[in-house]
Amino acid sequence: MYPRQKRIVDLVLATTVLVLLSPLLLLIVTAFGLDTLVVRRDRGPLLYAERRISRGREFSLLKFRTLREDVLMRAAGHARPYERDVANLTVAGRLLKRWYLDELPQLFNIVRGDMSFVGPRPWPPGLVEQQMRDGVDYRNHVVAGLTGAAQVTKGVPEARYAASDLDYVRELNTRRGWSVVAYDLRLMVRTLGVLARGQGLAD
């Protein structure tokens, strides 16, 4: 479930944003380098990848590393629960998480076609399998997104994420072509509002 028009907009927009944000990306790399130079426990790779599912296929989700490397090793491929504790974050990682900047490398995932700008957030294989055992399998049919309906509604409990995602899937089923793009753009504008308030987005 990935309309051609949606893919075209994703590719053009992701490429454009990468070019426009190249100074910011350079600044992040510089800040990360200074952090690892000054704070010994923050040392480690700039990027890390997690196994996630999009349209039933496994791919490597890219992120700027925000966790200390020793914590990341304990995370075993699912860092989100550890990111809630500020003590686990690097100095640079605290700023990246607040403004959602750790997700910027996923623009490359969008260019590659692993993800879209809008869709259910990609989950690790284990969580997708658990969701399928509960009788919910929409993640095997819909392309994952950088943001989605659940992420732009702050305060929604995690138990409601699936319901919000299913609302989005229903919209995809009832819309065609550019109508899907228009709906995505509305969610993207709402995402910018959340980011402007520095609230971060749920995974």
Go through each PLM region and give its residues:
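Short helix-coil transition/hinge motifs at the ends and kinks of transmembrane helices
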Residues: 37-42, 76-78, 174-176
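Residue-level signal for cytosolic alpha-helical hairpin/rod architecture
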Residues: 12, 89-92
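Hydrophobic structural segments characteristic of membrane proteins
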Residues: 52, 105-203
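A hydrophobic, helix-centered structural microdomain
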Residues: 1-69, 181-203
